[in-house]
Amino acid sequence: MAYRKRGARREANINNNDRMQEKDDEKQDQNNRMQLSDKVLSKKEEVVTDNQEEIKIADEVKKSTKEESKQLLEVLKTKEEHQKEIQYEILQKTIPTFEPKESILKKLEDIKPEQAKKQTKLFRIFEPRQLPIYRANGEKELRNRWYWKLKKDTLPDGDYDVREYFLNLYDQVLTEMPDYLLLKDMAVENKNSRDAGKVVDSETASICDAIFQDEETEGAVRRFIAEMRQRVQADRNVVNYPSILHPIDYAFNEYFLQHQLVEPLNNDIIFNYIPERIRNDVNYILNMDRNLPSTARYIRPNLLQDRLNLHDNFESLWDTITTSNYILARSVVPDLKELVSTEAQIQKMSQDLQLEALTIQSETQFLTGINSQAANDCFKTLIAAMLSQRTMSLDFVTTNYMSLISGMWLLTVVPNDMFIRESLVACQLAIVNTIIYPAFGMQRMHYRNGDPQTPFQIAEQQIQNFQVANWLHFVNNNQFRQVVIDGVLNQVLNDNIRDGHVINQLMEALMQLSRQQFPTMPVDYKRSIQRGILLLSNRLGQLVDLTRLLAYNYETLMACVTMNMQHVQTLTTEKLQLTSVTSLCMLIGNATVIPSPQTLFHYYNVNVNFHSNYNERINDAVAIITAANRLNLYQKKMKAIVEDFLKRLHIFDVARVPDDQMYRLRDRLRLLPVEVRRLDIFNLILMNMDQIERASDKIAQGVIIAYRDMQLERDEMYGYVNIARNLDGFQQINLEELMRTGDYAQITNMLLNNQPVALVGALPFVTDSSVISLIAKLDATVFAQIVKLRKVDTLKPILYKINSDSNDFYLVANYDWVPTSTTKVYKQVPQQFDFRNSMHMLTSNLTFTVYSDLLAFVSADTVEPINAVAFDNMRIMNEL
């Protein structure tokens, strides 16, 4: 168009050659302009040669041909994909989809036994600290003194009870409590040692350093530090290390050393650790590495059963656990191999059905959704649902007779309990009213909702034909057998299913049905049912093999389940489409698939780790509930304790667990006994609460309240301070008693009579450097609110110090100001650090190696799958 417009403006006598020449010139000019601008703007350096243009033209020609061929390929690809999509839509209308929740699988697989954590330091609550000494006038001396202080001296802000501090401390001890201690791993060099000796850990070494460098340290102590070293008794595999510990810390660490969970490891233990049924399974060849050192150790997993019975009345918790188990089980069920070609099978089925133009719609429906993906999906769903005891629901179209006939196989091999009742009733009713009753000319069954009997149970009483009634009887009584193996409750399939004999029973019933006259139905209807039965009966051998394969894979993987398989219907269900069951029945080949040994070991390890962690977390929660009860914090902390317990199991979304289940869980946890180690640790804390309170800079042992002013007293540790070191001469009231009774009259009367009163009991106090700012608000903050609100747990007395380190010291020195306060903090002196009393020798094994993965010593292989045999010593797959 542009060319014509330009030509219209020119003279009429311009010939065609000129026009063509002009057009080429214009194109070249434009190209040159573009190239020039590109060259100016580009940062590349370009070497100009004479024949550059010719080379570029040749390159452009090559590029254009390449682009054309690419476009052609893309067109062909999209055409192929489009055809595939159309085929997919035609053949695969109803395929179940499973989206694995990878996050849950990762959480489960990431649960590792906590024994793996290596201790690098001893457990300590206290540390020695160097504090200055103040003279009587508040000036700092050059000397200092050592006291034991708390390492983590943290009290949260807000209304806080010191008893909560002890509960948190106990929780911290439980978290850090080691399963084993190997002192050799944490020992460090003593820098001040004469002969390169070692002390037990880095904190002991740093304390020794600080004491050695302190000018006031006695020569005898320095000489002792220089002599500090380990003492090895090689013949007994024992080593003693010197340590510097507070007596309470020593009691903790000595207890940990005496109650280690490690046990000697030998080949028998590893052999017995492998599930018995896998050891005895002839399809698996297990070999063990026999070179275990004598110092090998392991920690026995804690596999106690059903202490909380989560299947009983914990619907949402049980649903989460079964979902996690289902996702894990699906990841280990083997994929089917060498399935029959979908196209070939559909062609064969079409021939068997003699599909032609006159064929009724119902028979073309038989082929809907048959594909290998659906077959594999169905196989994995059935086994994983049984392993995790997840309830299934069935999706089907009543007019697809092939689906219903496949459903008859499904109901034969999978126990009724595995299906949600509504779905089971709907499927059975469809089979009865579509196939069984019409065959015998019986009227449709009108099923009343809520009937305790299922349609098959009603039909069993009404059907006269022996074979059909016999099959119905089997289905109605098809339940899991509960068998305890190695202390674990297993849900075992019926022997007739395991060996595949039940399929003969099913086929007899189907043959009887196909021979019936269907007197009340048209001929086409009868023919459709007969052809559907024919399709399934043609694959009798493959169905027997499929049933044996399903049972074998289920029972082999079940050997790796460590928690009791409790059967309770789940809140949510796993959907199973009957078209996928048809796919499985029609496409199963003769290739045997069994789980690989590596898969079995992985599945077993994940189950053991989760189960062991579950029991340890129960022990922690039970211990903390007991501690909260004994510290009178029962009401306050209970829901938080249960929430923490669920969080530490990793798989629960705690925010979505209903409150009623939380409190039910608390009630179950309360009934359990406390594990001995955890109880002993709590008793250690309880016996030494006074020492721990003394060592804190934020916990007081009481508060003295008066209306008249009380002068600050001089203290070696702080200077001038409103601290009372004893309560002589004061009327005392116990804080616990006050909180329990809520009777404040006694205190009010004393204060009105100008008598100071001492409230005794552990409580937090506030420290602040500015005395003046505190004195102004002292009465209101410390006690007025308490009397008004009748809440002792908001009581926070204020401590302040005036010494040469504080800004207020000069006010006192210059103006002879005598600071006073209407409250005093009652605080006992912390324990003084004495080197001789703090020196302890700790004893442990010189060396041992802890193995967490016992199955790493086992090398395993399988026989050729084609030779794999089931429990009856016959090949799993017999049909060739």
Curated annotation (Swiss-Prot):
One of its GO terms (cellular component) is T=2 icosahedral viral capsid. The keyword Manganese does not apply. Keywords: Capsid protein, Inner capsid protein, Repeat, RNA-binding, T=2 icosahedral capsid protein, Ubl conjugation, Virion. InterPro entries: Rotavirus_VP2. Residues 19-30 have a biased composition (Basic and acidic residues). Its main location: virion. The keyword RNA-binding applies. The record marks 220, 224, 228, 839, 841 as: Interaction with the intermediate capsid protein VP6. Sumoylated with SUMO1 and SUMO2. Sumoylation of viral proteins seems to have a positive role on viral replication. Residues 1-39 are annotated as: Disordered. Inner capsid protein that self-assembles to form an icosahedral capsid with a T=2 symmetry, which consists of 120 copies of VP2, with channels at each of its five-fold vertices. This capsid constitutes the innermost concentric layer of the viral mature particle. It encapsidates the polymerase VP1, the capping enzyme VP3 and the genomic dsRNA, thereby defining the core. This is Inner capsid protein VP2. It comes from Rotavirus A (strain RVA/Cow/United States/WC3/1981/G6P7[5]).
